[in-house]
Regions:
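Catalytic cores of RNA-modifying enzymes
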Residues: 1-103
Length: 103
């Protein structure tokens, strides 16, 4: 994986610990029927393993470089949106979604 610099202005931090990722997913308790809104997927460390356990992930990432990186590793049930979550029109998503983020 190519090196992607952390941008402090967006408060970026990237999870690298697989045990922590597994713990977050376990506590989140995903279901195959779930639609998940992920805030700040970053490099996809949480996104990709979670995508195997839910119906769909809508991942909103502000950093266009990270969006490009995520698109290189396309997975069908992940919808990537390059936007600021504070401006994102979440009403465009059907009701009943869950929210996750490594903030």
């Amino acid at each position: 994986m190519k090196s992607i610099p952390i941008k402090k202005r967006w408060g970026q931090n990237f999870i690298n610990d697989k045990n922590l990722i597994d713990k977050i997913i376990s506590v989140f308790d995903p279901d195959k029927k779930d639609t998940v809104l992920e805030i700040g997927p970053g490099k996809g460390a949480l996104t990709y393993p979670l995508s195997k356990r839910v119906k769909k992930i809508i991942a909103v990432e502000i950093d266009p470089i990270l969006v490009s990186h995520l698109k290189e590793n396309f997975i069908e049930n992940i919808e990537l949106i390059n936007d600021d979550i504070l401006r994102f029109k979440h009403t465009s998503i059907k009701k009943g979604y869950k929210i996750i983020g490594n903030l």
